[in-house]
């Protein structure tokens, strides 16, 4: 293979990018409304509910662990 045949695909990679221009081009950043405009209340409720559940479970487990520690070490 000739060296020029090997360099041809590389020259496309090194060429500056051509940006499309014209009135038909739209920016992808303005296609939708910002996510904070209308919160998804189902996701918000699910997230807060899960957080509360995990904290309650963590505190309950911690209290059980403390009681088990005291029982094993004769502190109770």
Curated annotation (Swiss-Prot):
<dbReference type="GO" id="GO:0005739">
    <property type="term" value="C:mitochondrion"/>
</dbReference>
<keyword id="KW-0813">Transport</keyword>
<keyword id="KW-1133">Transmembrane helix</keyword>
<keyword id="KW-0679">Respiratory chain</keyword>
<comment type="function">
    <text>Accessory subunit of the mitochondrial membrane respiratory chain NADH dehydrogenase (Complex I), that is believed not to be involved in catalysis. Complex I functions in the transfer of electrons from NADH to the respiratory chain. The immediate electron acceptor for the enzyme is believed to be ubiquinone.</text>
</comment>
<keyword id="KW-0496">Mitochondrion</keyword>
<feature type="transmembrane region" description="Helical">
    <location>
        <begin position="41"/>
        <end position="59"/>
    </location>
</feature>
<dbReference type="GO" id="GO:0008137">
    <property type="term" value="F:NADH dehydrogenase (ubiquinone) activity"/>
</dbReference>
<dbReference type="InterPro" id="IPR026192">
    <property type="entry name" value="NDUFC1"/>
</dbReference>
<dbReference type="GO" id="GO:0006120">
    <property type="term" value="P:mitochondrial electron transport, NADH to ubiquinone"/>
</dbReference>
<dbReference type="GO" id="GO:0042776">
    <property type="term" value="P:proton motive force-driven mitochondrial ATP synthesis"/>
</dbReference>
<keyword id="KW-0809">Transit peptide</keyword>
<keyword id="KW-0999">Mitochondrion inner membrane</keyword>
<dbReference type="GO" id="GO:0045271">
    <property type="term" value="C:respiratory chain complex I"/>
</dbReference>
<keyword id="KW-0812">Transmembrane</keyword>
<comment type="similarity">
    <text>Belongs to the complex I NDUFC1 subunit family.</text>
</comment>
<keyword id="KW-0472">Membrane</keyword>
<protein>
    <recommendedName>
        <fullName>NADH dehydrogenase [ubiquinone] 1 subunit C1, mitochondrial</fullName>
    </recommendedName>
</protein>
<feature type="transit peptide" description="Mitochondrion">
    <location>
        <begin position="1"/>
        <end position="27"/>
    </location>
</feature>
<dbReference type="Pfam" id="PF15088">
    <property type="entry name" value="NADH_dh_m_C1"/>
</dbReference>
<dbReference type="GO" id="GO:0009060">
    <property type="term" value="P:aerobic respiration"/>
</dbReference>
<keyword id="KW-0249">Electron transport</keyword>
<comment type="subunit">
    <text>Complex I is composed of 45 different subunits.</text>
</comment>
<dbReference type="GO" id="GO:0005743">
    <property type="term" value="C:mitochondrial inner membrane"/>
</dbReference>
